[in-house]
Amino acid sequence: MAQISESAAIPRRTANHHGNVWDDDLILSLDSPYGAPAYYERVANLIEEMKHLLLREMEDSNHDLIRRLQIVDTLECLGIDRHFQHEIKTAALDYVYRCWNEKGIGMGSSDSGSKDLDATALGLRALRLHRYNVSSGVLENFKDENGKFFCNLTGDKRVRSMLSLLRASEISFPGEKVMQEAKAFTREYLTQVLAGRGDVTDVDQSLLREVKYALEFPWHWSVPRWEARSFIEIYGQNHSWLKSNINQKVLELAKLDFNILQCIHQKEIQFIVRWWRESEIAQLNFYRKRHVEFYFWVVICIFEPEFSQSRIAFAKICTVATVLDDLYDTHGMLDELKTVTEGVSRWDLPLIDDLPDNIKIAFQFFFNTANELAVEVVKKQGRDMIALLKANWQRYVESYLQEAEWIATRHVPSFDEYIKNARASSGMCIGNLIPLLLLGQLLANNIVEQIHSPSKIQELSELTIRLIDDIRDFEDEKERGEIASAIECYMKDNPDSTVENALNHLEGILHLSLEELNWEFIKQDTVPLCCKKFTFNIVRGLQFVYKYGDGLSISNKEVKDQIFKILIDQVPIEE
């Protein structure tokens, strides 16, 4: 690499990011009625009623296996499964697992000789997600002599079976060829059905909407809150496998639960808005204002009331990280950035006294927020973890300085060199660690080692976050004058490759990494599930907000509408 002199500087560039698309006063004016005790009482009563009704529904059927799986799937899609975890495990999944074998299952426990694709696919998906040991090899039983998947059913039942198979195929681990085959087959089949060119016509409209959702938002692109809002709108009173009185109660609970959670989330985003407005950084136009979008990213993934502190911490960290990103990418001279990096390394605020005011304000914003969050972590965990937090902030800003030096020297590193640095600059080293420590679990040192770098799940989350950003934001970053990206570095290592070749290569790495992440998330170990779920869902959340491009930097389009649906627009409830 070329030698960089102390006087070398990055020209002060302009990123031309759009301003805050949200009126903070509008956010602060939100006042949902769903915090009232009467709504909580109604939800509690509905939960108790439904526990008895659903247990009876599971048992009162010749198709007791698929009925149990349909109930579990419905509760999960509507976002209310957390109220029925005991019933889901003991009455549904334990029961299904006892009937499971290498050839699959039928619709009922009495159908020992008849295997059903819909029931088997639903079971494979649900059992895997709940950490039962089931093999994808069971799907080989649903291939014909030519190795093609088949389904003997017709009409809506055929479409439903293909949809269940698609959703099961997404919960794949590395090397599972049958899952890749199932995914390719069902996506093609359902795409044809949705276009009206399939072998089934006059498909139920609610079912078609489910198909559309599954094709538009595969599992790694879907998130719990968006799925719940979407399925509340899809879910009708015509779910023939549930009695009408249960249908009504399921839908009422889903709507009330969504609105009550939305009320809680509105109070949290109001807290974030006030925190932002009270900081000096809010008065500067140098930096992106995306505090609402960052809160949205985390709340669509981790929505339960008990994780409020982690959500707020994540939104704060991302807001600070974006200020640092803009500083290192756009506004800072190289000598200034070296001073900032040294200030973080030494945790020394006076060190930056001679820097321009906009940089001092940014550093003060970082310094205050990092210290406040460190105090919260120490209180929650009951021991001093300051050194660990400082080390990860240092790793983060040093990766930014490395990128700034590449820009200053017009240096494009090798792909491996870039990825090594990019893992740190993804921000997951700090954006994941602090919220995990605030989830409410006391985490022993050996557990922290299993969830934090260089653990496998942490390394995979860092890699996937960086690849998602580079793949979706490549053109915009190039226009802003950034030299090194995964695509540029791959093309340097492979001079004959095109941008399309590079993108295909990165998509392949991303796909494999997501399958590995599936395994790390689902495998049995000593790490608390809430910790693995947070890490895993944050990756899914970024896929979601980046689906149509960089939805965090360019948030005035699809993401703005999604934020409105999740945080502002109540689900209508008929009185």
UniProtKB/Swiss-Prot annotation:
Chain residues that bind Mg(2+) 2: 325, 329
Gene this chain is encoded by: TPS-Sell
Protein name: Delta-selinene-like synthase, chloroplastic
Binding-site positions, Mg(2+) 3: 469, 477
Induction info: Accumulates in apical leaders upon wounding in both resistant and susceptible to white pine weevil (Pissodes strobi) plants.
Lineage, top ranks: Eukaryota, Viridiplantae, Streptophyta, Embryophyta, Tracheophyta
Binding site for Mg(2+) 1: 325, 329
Sections of the chain in a coiled coil: none
Known catalytic reactions: (2E,6E)-farnesyl diphosphate = (+)-delta-selinene + diphosphate
Keywords carried by this UniProt record: Chloroplast, Lyase, Magnesium, Metal-binding, Plastid, Transit peptide
Pathway given in the UniProt record: Secondary metabolite biosynthesis; terpenoid biosynthesis; Terpene metabolism; oleoresin biosynthesis
CDD domains associated with the record: Terpene_cyclase_plant_C1 (cd00684)
PANTHER family attached to this UniProt entry: OS04G0344100 PROTEIN-RELATED (PTHR31225)
Family per similarity comment: Belongs to the terpene synthase family. Tpsb subfamily.
Chain sites annotated for binding (2E,6E)-farnesyl diphosphate: 288, 325, 329, 466, 469
Entry remark concerning the domains of this protein: The Asp-Asp-Xaa-Xaa-Asp/Glu (DDXXD/E) motif is important for the catalytic activity, presumably through binding to Mg(2+).
GO molecular function, one term: terpene synthase activity
